[in-house]
Amino acid sequence: MTFNHPVKELIWVVQPRSYTDCKAAKKETRTSITTRLLPYVYDKPAVYEQWIQMNGQDRLERRYGDYFNKVQPYQHHTGFVPGVGVYMYSFAIKPEENQPSGTCNFSRVDTATIVMTMDGSVAVNQDTDDTWNVRVYAINYNVLRIMSGMGGLAYSN
């Protein structure tokens, strides 16, 4: 991940490639296409365990996929329940508030990685779903400083 600025929360989605490239839509009937759009099969998440590394060091120990899907949202959000296959990690105590309550300055992090072990029992069509797409989003801050009539960003590389 190559993010800059202080990040208060990471959100990522794991889906089989065929769920996102519309190839499945050509083969499915109208009633079964809605089930193909979900990022899991057999009501099980595809990720068995995952953890976050920064600059080669573990930021968190290995956690089951449900930790990032159920525990983190429960601890840091009000009334938000992500779907299966949507994961998050909050660096802030209260990420929903505008007032900062914790961040990780990704401007100072050279390498950040989410390491995942996929669940071998979750199988989709082996002919089309041989790879997985992972999309990572970051909610971040930056500060516009104005001094002596000149403006500039507080956090930059």
Role assignments for model-derived ranges:
Residues 1-157:
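Flexible assembly/topogenesis modules
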